[in-house]
């Protein structure tokens, strides 16, 4: 094979696998282009990294093609083949969110597959909001953050962004040291995702984005859900009302509410024997004691209650709110093992203590 033909083959391989030509194997192949060099020595680690990169690139290409086909079916541009009624969806792991599907697993319905276009739009909007010094009235949710991280993980082009944001999961650490090639790759990924000119994206923008995501990941709001029950009617009321009037007015609607989640009878807790994963999970939840979780839940209940009172123009009575915690106080009081448990129970039930003097009739 001539040097020109060999160069064309290497260039064709570069365009398919590594267009920026950043892998370490390319400089080691250049001596083959010289006539006096008929052999080349390759490092084993470099060759293994090259093969792993090729395999990962091929797998991501297959996943992107499948996502494009699934989005085409979800958009109604193709005929969807009805799945048999007896077919059951593939069981999804409870904890391992990023696990790839098994090749032998049954095919899922098209509406359950991931639409990568929607994930990309969510990632672009959120990174634009956290990177640039601009204001936006858009309301972002926790699902947007999850969709952003899933997209960055699945995409080979933006995987460097995921690696950078992954360093903020544990604590507020400094940005890791990067070479000039890694910095250029990261900046190119941000420019490509945001579709912004090169003059507005620099390393300072990346630092702002990383610190913003760090505050987002370590925020207690990301760990506890916030539930607000609102009506479909107007949210403002001119006349001041009371809690009793609201219960009478909304009683029928509250009774008609149905649960939105259910558990199948055959659902089982999956067994996980990955010791490293369990250690990382325990390290993550260890700094958060149970009392702190209850405190955050009570704090969320308080703010949710105040928002509902404000929306309904209802008079706030502190005793109505304290009724929520009376049951917990009684449980804590009777959990203490002492000799006065029976007397306290009688007092709680409205019965006098057996040691007290009884009134004779």
Swiss-Prot record:
Annotated region (LXCXE motif), positions in chain: 32-36
Major location category of this protein: host cell
Compartments, as annotated in UniProt: Host nucleus; Virion
Nuclear localization signal (motif): residue ranges: 357-360
Task of the protein: Plays a role in host nuclear actin polymerization by recruiting p78/73 protein that is capable of activating an actin-related protein 2/3 complex to initiate nuclear actin polymerization.
Quaternary structure and interacting proteins, as annotated: Forms a complex with proteins E27 and p78/83. The interaction with p78/83 mediates nuclear translocation of P78/83. Interacts with protein Ac102. Interacts with IE0.
Name of the protein in question: Protein C42
Source organism (scientific name): Autographa californica nuclear polyhedrosis virus
């Amino acid at each position: 094979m001539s040097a020109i033909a060999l160069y064309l083959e290497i260039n064709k391989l570069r365009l398919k696998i590594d267009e920026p030509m950043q892998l370490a194997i390319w400089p080691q192949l250049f001596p083959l282009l010289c006539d006096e060099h008929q052999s080349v020595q390759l490092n084993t680690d470099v060759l293994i990294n090259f093969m792993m990169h090729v395999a990962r690139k091929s797998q991501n290409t297959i996943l992107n093609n499948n996502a494009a086909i699934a989005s085409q079916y979800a958009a109604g541009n193709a005929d969807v083949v009805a799945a048999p009624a007896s077919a059951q969806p593939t069981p999804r792991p409870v904890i391992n969110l990023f696990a790839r599907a098994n090749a032998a697993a049954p095919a899922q319905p098209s509406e359950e597959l991931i639409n990568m276009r929607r994930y990309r739009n969510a990632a672009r909007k959120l990174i634009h909001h956290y990177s640039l010094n601009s204001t936006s009235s858009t309301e972002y949710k926790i699902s947007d953050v999850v969709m952003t991280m899933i997209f960055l993980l699945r995409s080979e082009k933006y995987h460097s962004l995921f690696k950078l944001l992954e360093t903020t999961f544990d604590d507020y650490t400094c940005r890791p040291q990067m070479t000039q090639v890694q910095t250029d790759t990261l900046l190119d990924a941000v420019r490509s995702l945001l579709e912004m000119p090169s003059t507005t994206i620099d390393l300072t923008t990346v630092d702002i984005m990383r610190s913003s995501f760090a505050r987002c990941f370590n925020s207690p709001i990301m760990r506890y859900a916030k539930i607000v029950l609102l009506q479909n009617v107007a949210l403002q009321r001119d006349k001041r009302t009371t809690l009793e009037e609201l219960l009478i007015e909304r009683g029928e609607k509250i009774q008609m509410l149905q649960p939105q989640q259910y558990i199948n009878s055959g659902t089982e807790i999956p067994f996980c024997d990955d010791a490293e994963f369990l250690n990382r999970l325990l390290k993550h939840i260890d700094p958060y004691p149970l009392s702190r979780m209850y405190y955050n839940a009570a704090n969320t209940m308080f703010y949710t209650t105040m928002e509902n009172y404000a929306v309904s123009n209802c008079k706030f009575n502190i005793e109505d709110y304290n009724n929520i915690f009376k049951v917990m106080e009684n449980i804590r009081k009777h959990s203490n093992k002492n000799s006065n448990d029976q007397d306290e129970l009688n007092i709680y039930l409205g019965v006098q203590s057996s040691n007290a003097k009884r009134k004779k009739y």
